[in-house]
Amino acid sequence: MQRGGATAPAGIGTGEGGQRMATTKPGIGRAAARAHLSACPVLGPVVAQVGPLRLSPVRREPYEALVRAIAHQQVHGRAAEAMLARLLALAPAADFPPPARVLALPEAALRGCGFSAAKVAAIRDIAATAEAGHLPSRRAAARLSDAELIARLTALRGVGRWTVEMLLIFTLGRPDVLPVDDFGVREGYRLAAGLDAQPKPRDLATIGEAWAPHRSAAAWYLWRAADLAKQARREAPAAM
């Protein structure tokens, strides 16, 4: 099971640029999502505090998105970005190291980027699958449902549901994905609801049914709730 950190994985794409969130259904967008979530007793105050939804997918091929998501598994966002920067430096002529380049790199070079042995194995498997033509392109992925992509991509080494959910939200712009295994999402809900403990993933999934068809936006606001609490803790000593 993969879990994110306390906040949305920055390198995957948090949509801070204020661009429109891509959707797969006409009429589902930022204004509709905000209005729907504002009616929730728990999320409503978060929406009011955070303001407009700024979730925007980054146009990447699933290969790149999955490698980036692997980097972000169970580490702080800054650490993941440092590892990815070292990986990019190994293929300076490309925007992102192509599968063939990754497969040609010795394991020591990938370990030198900071990736664990498990992450190196996962990245190599993703690259090999892409090089063989068995990883769907962005265009092909757009024709598959969320469930189909989760079933297909979790067959890859090291790729769990959370990893695919990050691709669905931040690369494909799917509007109704709630990553209940994500620490930041559950922590955001705990804070917003005033709970002593985080909800269990299955309980949050049940709670989140009321947020459909805007569960990706709900996740974004829950990440922001966790961010705001983290920021408040950092600023508290300075205010004393």
Protein language model features and the residues they cover:
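Short polybasic linear motifs
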Residues: T7
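C-terminal end-helix/capping segment
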Residues: D182-E209, M240
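N-terminal polyanion-binding entry modules of DNA glycosylases/AP lyases
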Residues: Q2-G4, G13-L144, T206-M240
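A general secondary-structure boundary signal
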Residues: L84, A151-T154, P201
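Catalytic DNA-binding helix-loop module of base-excision-repair DNA glycosylases/AP lyases
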Residues: A71, S145-L191
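Alpha-helix capping at helix-to-loop junctions
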Residues: A89, A93, A128-L135, A155-G158, ...
